[in-house]
């Protein structure tokens, strides 16, 4: 080893002036540099010591440069915890050498989450890490005892009159489509109605007056289900009081409003959401003609219910809820009343109130049957005028009219057994309907006809047979 070091010194002789730059750097090693110069000038230091000093200085520079970067990788300190380098050089333990060291003094840090650490950039801590509950410092100058045990909840402002009508009108109109009272109740609970609870029946009744009979039935059912959950019986009484006061204005848009409001009152008393003495409390105190008519209508309906008539039938069952037999009877009664009165508008109104546009072909069928069974011309002409009016007003559609005629065409052989002249009457009626524009030419051509029987004296083609004598 000494021989190799001597050869190295001979090849690269050490320059005393540049020794400080090659061996040490920094102010902390300035004293050691001057001592080495003196020792070299004294010519008593060995070559092996110089080489060892160079290696130690190089290791110290590397350690100082990579101390903060390589502190957690174990490149500088051995695995057994000793302060010895893998090359065998001892790590300097000078307090001044650790002054600018960024490594944690305890080896593990303070245990706090680091921003940009395991959770990612800008995240404090790893995902799912649970921190301790922050305890309130009572001695904190900003401490407020009112902030402890606070419960926060969303506060909905009460609706004013304008917002009330704007918010509830779509809800009630949508209810007329789906008929789910529970959904309406849930939506009303989310609103802060406040003192406007009594306005719910008023708005519902006013919208139902402009609708159909089925809408009024649904409104009565809605009021019955909402009473006790969203509003009380006193709210219902206040609402009907307001409806009676508003009857003069309601009658301008709906002339039948007094009778309809009376039916609503009778139904409410029957459902138990109005007390039985509600109508009696108005006796002798009503000056409005419309309000008096509404109360009289309610009194009549309630007196009829005592005789066994159900109060649920004040509106009837609308639309598809009715049975086929019931609809057939209603249409038959409608046609008979029309033949007696001759009022086409009333017949059209009664047909619309049935709310069965898919069953209008039954009216066409029954009307033609009456024509075939009649013996005079009045029924023929009145039924023709009725079908013409219903066709022009689009009350009966093309498909319903066509279906009614096709039913007659298919059943005319059986009808002819009871009505011998049905074929000829049907041909004449179909031709008149075509001339009036009620049916198309194609539908007219489908009308069945029965061939005329030839007499015995008629030959082929209608020619008379020549006499054989």
Curated annotation (Swiss-Prot):
Keywords: Acetylation, Apoptosis, Cytoplasm, Nucleus, Phosphoprotein, Repeat, RNA-binding, Tumor suppressor, Ubl conjugation. Coiled coil: none annotated. A motif (Nuclear localization signal) lies at residues 58-64, 448-454. A motif (Phosphodegron) lies at residues 70-76. Its main location: nucleus. Polyubiquitinated, leading to its proteasomal degradation. Rapidly degraded in response to mitogens. Phosphorylation of the phosphodegron promotes interaction with BTRC and proteasomal degradation. InterPro entries: ARM-type_fold, Initiation_fac_eIF4g_MI, PDCD4. Residues 84-93 have a biased composition (Polar residues). It comes from the Eukaryota. The keyword Amino-acid biosynthesis does not apply. It holds the Pfam family MA3. Binds EIF4A1 via both MI domains. This is Programmed cell death protein 4. It comes from Pongo abelii. The gene is PDCD4.
């Amino acid at each position: 080893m000494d021989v190799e070091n001597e050869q190295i010194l001979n090849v690269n002789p050490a320059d005393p002036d540049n020794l400080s730059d090659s061996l040490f750097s920094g102010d902390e090693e300035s004293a050691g540099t001057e001592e080495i110069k003196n020792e070299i000038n004294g010519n008593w230091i060995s070559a092996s010591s110089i080489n060892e000093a160079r290696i130690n200085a190089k290791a110290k520079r590397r350690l100082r440069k990579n101390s903060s970067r390589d502190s957690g990788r174990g490149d500088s300190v051995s695995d057994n915890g000793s302060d010895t380098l893998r090359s065998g050089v001892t790590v300097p333990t000078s307090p001044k050498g650790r002054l600018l060291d960024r490594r944690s003094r305890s080896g593990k840090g303070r245990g706090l989450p680091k921003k940009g650490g395991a959770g990612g950039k800008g995240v404090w801590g790893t995902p799912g890490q649970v921190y301790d509950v922050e305890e309130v410092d009572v001695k904190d100058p900003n401490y407020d005892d009112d902030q402890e045990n606070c419960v926060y909840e969303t506060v909905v402002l009460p609706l004013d009159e304008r917002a009330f009508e704007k918010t509830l009108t779509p809800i009630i109109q949508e209810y007329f489509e789906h008929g789910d009272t529970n959904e309406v109740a849930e939506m009303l609970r989310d609103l802060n109605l406040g003192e406007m609870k009594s306005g719910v029946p008023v708005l519902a009744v006013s919208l139902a007056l402009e609708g159909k009979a089925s809408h009024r039935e649904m409104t009565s059912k809605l009021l019955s289900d909402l009473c006790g959950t969203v509003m009380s019986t006193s709210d219902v009484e206040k609402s009907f009081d307001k409806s009676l006061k508003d009857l003069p204005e309601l009658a301008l848009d709906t002339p039948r409003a007094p009778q309809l409001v009376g039916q609503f009152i009778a139904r409410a008393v029957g459902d138990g959401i109005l007390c039985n003495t509600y109508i009696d409390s108005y006796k002798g105190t009503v000056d409005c003609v419309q309000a008096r008519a509404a109360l009289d209508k309610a009194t009549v309906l309630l007196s009829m219910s005592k005789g066994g008539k159900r109060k649920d039938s004040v509106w009837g069952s609308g639309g598809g809820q009715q049975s086929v037999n019931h609809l057939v009877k209603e249409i038959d009664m409608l046609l008979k009343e029309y033949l007696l009165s001759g009022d086409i508008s009333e017949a059209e109104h009664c047909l619309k109130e049935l709310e069965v546009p898919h069953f209008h072909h039954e009216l066409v069928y029954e009307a033609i049957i009456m024509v075939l069974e009649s013996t005079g011309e009045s029924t023929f002409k009145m039924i023709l005028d009725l079908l013409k009016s219903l066709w022009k007003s689009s009350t009966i559609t093309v498909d319903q009219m066509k279906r009614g005629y096709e039913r007659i065409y298919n059943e005319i052989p059986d009808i002819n057994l009871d009505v011998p002249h049905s074929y000829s009457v049907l041909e004449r009626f179909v031709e008149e309907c075509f001339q009036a524009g009620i049916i198309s030419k194609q539908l007219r051509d489908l009308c069945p006809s029965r061939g005329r029987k030839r007499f015995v004296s008629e030959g082929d083609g209608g020619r008379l047979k020549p006499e054989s004598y």
